[in-house]
Amino acid sequence: MTPSISWSLLLLAGLCCLVPSFLAEDVQETDTSQKDQSPASHEIATNLGDFALRLYRELVHQSNTSNIFFSPVSIATAFAMLSLGSKGDTHTQILEGLQFNLTQTSEADIHKSFQHLLQTLNRPDSELQLSTGNGLFVNNDLKLVEKFLEEAKNHYQAEVFSVNFAESEEAKKVINDFVEKGTQGKIVEAVKKLDQDTVFALANYILFKGKWKQPFDPENTEEAEFHVDESTTVKVPMMTLSGMLDVHHCSMLSSWVLLMDYAGNTTAVFLLPDDGKMQHLEQTLNKELISQFLLNRRRSDAQIHIPRLSISGNYNLKTLMSPLGITRIFNNGADLSGITEENAPLKLSKAVHKAVLTIDETGTEAAAATVLQVATYSMPPIVRFDHPFLFIIFEEHTQSPIFVGKVVDPTHK
């Protein structure tokens, strides 16, 4: 290979899926009452909260009439790992685009934060299945910088595969097999086509299989109307749950807020805006409010109705990350000289993010959570998620947002 050739890098960031799961009966309980208060955890949660909301708002800006589903953890992990081999403006843009203040946080602490987060997500003794994986696919005649390789393995638990990108079908199969296996077959054909000058690919996936602590009874699921907009209504299977639930109305957001726990240490926050208040919710929601919802748990007698659904997201990260200031890595001025020892310039030719979500009735009986139980209404409220709503799924120990979504039409997969 000669220095005049420009090589391409393919980034498959955040190939993720979230599906319901039945847990084994003999699974051991873990103590989830203690939040992880280490500086690394606090740092990553703060930045990921900002990053998740900026990314969400950019997706809304690009299309306000579509379902949204993505994993901020996966996207941030992939770009942070890539930053290990970047230099100059390319390096600065990546980390600042991920909402890190480089005057307050050292690069070493950033990577330690991601290392700690990935270790937390991949804990084998959790009551739910939550796992991540990073794969580096390197052309068989390309020599990587040893420091990049070491740090990618150490901080990001990366696996390295030697492939022949000249045989594009064979290389594509190796990458797709890695993702398909990691997501247990939920995401196939992550790569449909490889650019002919690709010599290096990075793939990141996240798999989450969880069960509700308070399950929905399938016998109570009935067909109901969901109002996509003022003129469009669709029929959906609507799940129903009654009892002591963590649901309240937030006047600041003009929205109902519902918190539902998965077995283990993961919580889903659902946000249902009042009529005509979706834009207000999207503009007002911030990480401080979300943190308060997670910390100040309260239950009251209520009934909720929420659609059973399967949605997915498929995004071109070049158009998504550019408004966040991450641009240099995608053009010929990219400095990724810390990745390979070769002289030819390397740029990120393509970056894609694919995500799949399924929400249904399955769950486990709840062990009583330690919460403040209050009754706000004289009559139990009935909250119907029968028009567009948002949701965020958090890992509770680190309070990191692992999934973010918006349901506009539950019938669109």
UniProtKB/Swiss-Prot annotation:
Pfam families: Serpin (PF00079). GO terms for molecular function: serine-type endopeptidase inhibitor activity. SUPFAM superfamilies: Serpins (SSF56574). Residues 368-387 are annotated as: RCL. It is found in: Secreted. Keywords: Glycoprotein, Protease inhibitor, Secreted, Serine protease inhibitor, Signal. PROSITE patterns: SERPIN (PS00284). Its main location: secreted. PANTHER family: ALPHA-1-ANTITRYPSIN, SERINE PROTEASE INHIBITOR, SERPIN. Murine alpha-1-antitrypsin is represented by a cluster of up to 6 individual Serpina1-related genes. The precise complement of Serpina1-related genes present varies according to the strain of the animal. The reactive center loop (RCL) extends out from the body of the protein and directs binding to the target protease. The protease cleaves the serpin at the reactive site within the RCL, establishing a covalent linkage between the carboxyl group of the serpin reactive site and the serine hydroxyl of the protease. The resulting inactive serpin-protease complex is highly stable. Variability within the reactive center loop (RCL) sequences of Serpina1-related genes may determine target protease specificity. Inhibitor of serine proteases. Can inhibit trypsin and chymotrypsin; relatively ineffective against elastase. Belongs to the serpin family. This is Alpha-1-antitrypsin 1-4. It comes from Mus musculus. The gene is Serpina1d.
